[in-house]
Amino acid sequence: MELLGSTLTATYAHPPPASASFLPAIGTITSSYKDRFPHRNLTHSLSLPWRPNTYYKTAYNYPTLAPYSSRSQRVCESTMLPFVSNRTTFFTRYTPDDWYRSNLVSFQESNSSRHNSERLRVDTSRLIQDKYQQIRKTQAHSTQNLGERVNDLAFWKSEITHELDEMIGETNALTDIKRRLERGLIETEGPLQVSRECLFHREKRMGIDLVHDEAEKELLAEVDTILCCQERMRQHLDKANAQLASDRSAQHELEKDLSDKQAALRIDDKCQHLRNTSEGVSYFRGVERVDATVSVPETWAKFTDDNVLRSQSERAASAKLREETENLLIVTANEMWNQFNKVNLAFTNRIAETVDAKNKIHTHLTKTLQEIFQIEMTIESIKKAIKEKSAFLKVAQTRLDERTRRPNVELCRDMAQLRLVNEVYEVDETIQTLQQRLRDSEDTLQSLAHTKATLEHDLAVKANTLYIDQEKCMSMRNSYPSTLRLVGYC
């Protein structure tokens, strides 16, 4: 509603004009300054004679009230603005009672202020002394706490230093056993190469000597043994590398924690010895409101304790691995040496068998050669005998042939004729028998020659086998590494 003015008996107001007015709506102005300036009722002090009695006033909208009507409702007296036109005469501002009351109030306020000031002075003096003692006590407690903190830091520093020394020693020991394991693994390559070379050379055996004998079985077992030992050594080498990484990680955490402890110890020791007269003390505004802490005493102690426990656990695992590696080196060296001895024993037995077989073959070959010589002599004697018997046969047959020329009745089957016929048959049968014996002897000679060739071939085979086993294989196996080298010592 727009307020137009008032008289002694009435107040005039009507709804705001249409939007054709050049002034903005009061509601718009009110909404644009909402919550900026609180609503205040105009007082009498604003109604001065020189101010106009018609003006605009910021209105406040009460949504729970009914629309304003000049007929049914009147303007509330608390919201009515006084105007100069309402005054009938000039009036004074205060009464004598107000004046006395004001003086009394001033005196009372003065007494109260002085009393409060005196009490404040006494309380302040007492407060200064109390706070001074409290601050000194607080500073002493802080110094004591810093001293306890320094002691805790020194204790954990000594624990970390001791554990760090132990870890460094364990790491060095594990590094040494790892180097021995690497050297032992390298040393196994030589025996493995020797075993494979022996198998390769024995493949060059000839004929029946290319047999899967005990020596070859032991050589294959030696290769398997060495490969198995190498695999176990590689596995322990991988474990050693992993354990070294864990040890170095734990050592790094200890070194980092030790470095932090040393820095904190220097700082807290410096803070403990700071006094009010010390150099370097200054104001650092707001530092107490900055909470840069990342732990509490429990988690702080647990952090270092966990690092120490982790280091101890890694050291125990490292010591166990070292013991296992040491045992592995000894066991693998013994296994390889035992198998090496088995192979050598098998070679020795096989060489002895081959030498014995070779000697027997040589004996049989000698006898065969002798028999060949004898059978050749027999063949010559048979041929000579056949030749001699042929002369008797020719004489007998010539006699018979001559007697066939006897004339007429002289061709008598007399005793001489019968004897000559029997002689021819007898000599011819003898020659046939000798010729059969000659053929048999020649067949026997051929068989003996074949046997001789076979024995000579077998002798060459045995000689080749002996050369391979005795000269090549056994000579290579003389360079087998010692037990000390197999366990990693130079």
Curated annotation (Swiss-Prot):
Keyword Hydrolase applies: no
Tissue note: Expressed preferentially in testis. Expressed predominantly in late pachytene spermatocytes and early round spermatids. Expressed in spermatozoa.
PTM annotation, UniProt: N- and O-glycosylated.
GO cellular component, one term: acrosomal vesicle
Keywords, comma-separated and alphabetical: Cell projection, Cilium, Coiled coil, Cytoplasm, Cytoplasmic vesicle, Cytoskeleton, Flagellum, Glycoprotein, Membrane, Ubl conjugation
Disruption phenotype: Sperm with reduced motility (47%) and forward progression and increased flagellar structural bending defects. However, normal fertility is maintained.
Subcellular localization, as worded in the UniProt entry: Cytoplasm, Cytoskeleton, Cilium axoneme; Cytoplasm, Cytoskeleton, Flagellum axoneme; Cytoplasmic vesicle, Secretory vesicle, Acrosome outer membrane
Coiled-coil intervals: 415-461
Highest taxon listed in the record's lineage: Eukaryota
Membrane-topology annotation of the record: Peripheral membrane protein
Summary of subunit composition and partner proteins: Microtubule inner protein component of sperm flagellar doublet microtubules. Interacts with TEKT1, TEKT2, TEKT4 and TEKT5. Interacts with CCDC38.
Name used for this protein in its record: Tektin-3
Upper lineage: Eukaryota, Metazoa, Chordata, Craniata, Vertebrata
